[in-house]
Amino acid sequence: EGSAADAVEHLLERDRPAMSWLNLGEVHYVLARRHGDAEATEAVRDLEAVLDVRLPEADVVLAAARIKARLPMAYADAFTAATALDRDAELWTGDPELLVPGAAWRWRDLRPSG
């Protein structure tokens, strides 16, 4: 099996994965803290070109709130799950908070095995 980066690269070659602007904002602030605003802005621009990024609608916001109320996870993670449900998409992640057995959303574990 290849790395998570390889799996995501192959996904991007054949599809346009979904992401919420809320989560893309999270990507920006993490990168800005590590590498500065200019690099973070460039990375977001690059991701916007290959992802289907949308602002969350009210029903997705409320779905995220319901997920957060039921499960011990960050609100941004709840948005990730709600976006996957809204788009009927498999959530690709290595975040243990989102790898919930029996969750309403489908997920693929990108953590290295072993």
PLM features: what roles do these ranges have?
Residues 81-114:
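Acidic, PIN/NYN-like endoribonuclease modules and their adjacent C-terminal/linker elements
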Residues 52-94:
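Active-site neighborhoods of divalent-metal-dependent phosphate/nucleic-acid chemistry enzymes
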Residues 1-19, 32-45:
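Short, well-structured N-terminal submotif of metal-dependent ribonuclease cores
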Residues 18, 54, 108:
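General small-molecule cofactor/ligand-binding pocket signal
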Residues 34-38, 71, 107-112:
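Short, hinge-like loop/turn segments at secondary-structure boundaries
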